[in-house]
């Protein structure tokens, strides 16, 4: 009986389960403060599990990605689209930073009063702080959640191991798969954690806490739409000197629509390949560029990482300098490139960006947990942007005469 319940839950739709968790959390939060405090234990356990697995995930994910990927035999077109993917992701990240400056959002969180809200403001202090974090002991970086140190050692390890044997690389691939399975298990428990977090938030802050979540979601979605219709349109126009919107709407209709519901760039690869074939793009090109885009073209993820990191900074009262904003855009770009193929990958990389501002690790993980709450919509829009941009950039880099008459 009990095993059947577990199997039924494991096979259930995560979105539906999260929605049920949110609804029950609101009801409990309104009806009973005592029960909400008990339910909050589930939220604490969930955020603790995320805190435990996130450093190892970032380290293994980035190390394995650098160690195993080989672009040495890529042609000029592939090199061009790699550059375009990274540039597009950077512009999306920079756009998210600007959006947060114009429309800052503050979250209502417990324990913000005790958070570390001091951040270096002078350029020399910023670089000194960054350097000390970068050269941190790797074991200490993993245990303390120093994500800049983790990122540094992961990149260094990936480069150092790039020329090791295929058998050694397979070991890291297997370890990576094992860590991803643990992450998948933790994310599958999200409905319980979200239930506890929402119940406690409603009981402690009332509608004010939920309203801040809605504001954050609106900012995220609006920024992603701006990237879709303005940033991407400008990139296409400057690259082709043609009206970008016919191609953009084809990509939205035939790629973004499906990606919105699958919530997976990898799962949308066959859809994107079929669309590229209809557009008349060379198979030899899109056969490489589309799977590659599903791996490193993460404009939506960059938006999520940048906005949620700055929201965490706003919440604890940290003033962000222009230099820090620029560094955040770079960090969010490369962090987003490592977020592919991971359930909630962009959310789990938020502490990496938060470490730039000396934001308390507990506060960063509370923001991650809120990201899972709004992720019902955020993740769908993020994936739609990521996946449709794969086809968009593939089309303009292909140099083929495109077929716009697609039904």
Curated annotation (Swiss-Prot):
It catalyses: L-serine(in) + Na(+)(in) = L-serine(out) + Na(+)(out); L-threonine(in) + Na(+)(in) = L-threonine(out) + Na(+)(out). One of its GO terms (molecular function) is neutral L-amino acid:sodium symporter activity. It is found in: Cell inner membrane. The chain crosses the membrane at residues 12-32, 42-62, 81-101, 141-161, 179-199, 218-238, 245-267, 288-308, 330-350. Keywords: Amino-acid transport, Cell inner membrane, Cell membrane, Membrane, Symport, Transmembrane, Transmembrane helix, Transport. InterPro entries: Na-dicarboxylate_symporter, Na:dicarbo_symporter_sf, Ser_Thr_transp_SstT. The keyword Cell membrane applies. GO terms for biological process: serine transport; threonine transport. It is a multi-pass membrane protein. One of its GO terms (cellular component) is plasma membrane. Involved in the import of serine and threonine into the cell, with the concomitant import of sodium (symport system). Belongs to the dicarboxylate/amino acid:cation symporter (DAACS) (TC 2.A.23) family. NCBIfam families: PRK13628.1 (NF010151). HAMAP family: Ser_Thr_transp_SstT. This is Serine/threonine transporter SstT.
